[in-house]
Amino acid sequence: MARTGAEYIEALKTRPPNLWYKGEKVEDPTTHPVFRGIVRTMAALYDLQHDPRYREVLTYEEEGKRHGMSFLIPKTKEDLKRRGQAYKLWADQNLGMMGRSPDYLNAVVMAYAASADYFGEFAENVRNYYRYLRDQDLATTHALTNPQVNRARPPSGQPDPYIPVGVVKQTEKGIVVRGARMTATFPLADEVLIFPSTLLQAGSEKYALAFALPTSTPGLHFVCREALVGGDSPFDHPLSSRVEEMDCLVIFDDVLVPWERVFILGNVELCNNAYAATGALNHMAHQVVALKTAKTEAFLGVAALMAEGIGADVYGHVQEKIAEIIVYLEAMRAFWTRAEEEAKENAYGLLVPDRGALDGARNLYPRLYPRIREILEQIGASGLITLPSEKDFKGPLGPFLEKFLQGAALEAKERVALFRLAWDMTLSGFGARQELYERFFFGDPVRMYQTLYNVYNKEPYKERIRAFLKESLKVFEEVQA
């Protein structure tokens, strides 16, 4: 059933993840200064499911119980649109800056479950895990990337065969795994999902695996990077105080994975095709397009308010820059709409959003985002670094700040609050991390384009040109005759 924020927080207190920060075990992330902000933010998302204003958007009813909308297995385009509306509502709460809200990976697990026959002997495990996640409404994280030890060599060619996560042995109770994965974003989750990573070569069977575990599992460790939380003040740090999700290295120190939590084992082909064959790639990208749309809307809103606030909106070059963001926003909306309107069933009967539209969005946005960020910096200019704190306004020089930092259409404190938001979106550590995240969210941009080149059906367009040239040659020969 749809969870509440209090239930999420209580689960973190009762079964905290094995979280390490600056060499120390984090015993209670709900009160830790680095993590308490994102914990409150996640709890607020769960509570939104119970708000009478949003209940019908964020949840659906099945067998007398209400579940999060991201668990709905779509049968119609209307179902897809309902899922998209729920994605967008959650994304709007944090200006599209939260990449690991639960709906992101719920979309993957839902697609896996709806296409469970793909997983052969582990099909029932996948179905059961979906029902478990849905009924408990758990938060999940995942880790896809192998440690960057030697990127020129496959997993089996690393200095230690257990640098990437691999199977050590099989027992009556399950499989024992050892190794590590990088970039587990949002470790304040109930569960961690280890799904297929990069394409595996033949002979890499011990790395061909997919499974899920509670984040509190013995032998499982999340080692955090340095925090980007600037402080507790939502005035000074409007984003990092609330949406610092944290990124981690995940270590598996001979961890037992029970058989009922194993989804793929030793099958390289299944691993390599899992996302595409099940529709998980499309459904994950559907959530992402809604998220990026919300993010682009936020940049547009901030840019427009900044320009108006300091009287810069009268200049043509400023209008041009803001219009550029509008163009990008409308492109994302078009990708999103087409993905839903041209959805088709996959081989397992799951309605899947159109991949062509989604591939367009997920290849374009990593190139758009740095430009969107740059536009905000160009509009804000020196105003983005002349930003006193909340305490300065309350201090003895407050009256001076009210005079010198006012805007054409804003009081001083309003103007500084707006520009501090723009600073947190662009120039702060949080803002810089957001750009890196967007550049590589779906992987190496060059490989992404190569994949698009290889999977996209170019034949109809090639044939049109052949026919055109053939007709042109025919006309030329007739004229010559």
UniProtKB/Swiss-Prot annotation:
Q: Which residues form a coiled coil?
A: none
* Origin: domain of life: Bacteria
Q: Which UniProt keywords apply?
A: Aromatic hydrocarbons catabolism, FAD, Flavoprotein, Monooxygenase, Oxidoreductase
GO MF annotation terms? 4-hydroxyphenylacetate 3-monooxygenase activity; flavin adenine dinucleotide binding; oxidoreductase activity, acting on the CH-CH group of donors
User: In which pathway does this enzyme or protein participate?
Assistant: Aromatic compound metabolism; 4-hydroxyphenylacetate degradation; pyruvate and succinate semialdehyde from 4-hydroxyphenylacetate: step 1/7
Q: Which reaction does it catalyse?
A: 4-hydroxyphenylacetate + FADH2 + O2 = 3,4-dihydroxyphenylacetate + FAD + H2O + H(+)
Q: Which InterPro entries match?
A: Acyl-CoA_Oxase/DH_mid-dom_sf (IPR046373), AcylCo_DH-like_C (IPR036250), AcylCoA_DH/oxidase_NM_dom_sf (IPR009100), HpaB/PvcC/4-BUDH (IPR004925), HpaB/PvcC/4-BUDH_C (IPR024719), HpaB/PvcC/4-BUDH_N (IPR024674), HpaB_Deino-type (IPR012687)
A GO BP term, please? phenylacetate catabolic process
Return the EC number.
1.14.14.9
- Residues annotated as binding FAD are 142-144, 148-151, 185, 444-447
* Sequence positions that bind substrate: 100-104, 142, 197-198
Q: Which family does it belong to?
A: Belongs to the FADH(2)-utilizing monooxygenase family.
Per the entry, what this protein does is:
Utilizes FADH(2) supplied by HpaC, to catalyze the hydroxylation of 4-hydroxyphenylacetic acid, leading to the production of 3,4-dihydroxyphenylacetic acid (DHPA).
Query: Subunit details for this protein?
Result: Homotetramer consisting of a dimer of dimers. 4-HPA 3-monooxygenase consists of a reductase component HpaC and an oxygenase component HpaB.
Please state what the protein is called: 4-hydroxyphenylacetate 3-monooxygenase oxygenase component
Which species does this protein come from? Thermus thermophilus (strain ATCC 27634 / DSM 579 / HB8)
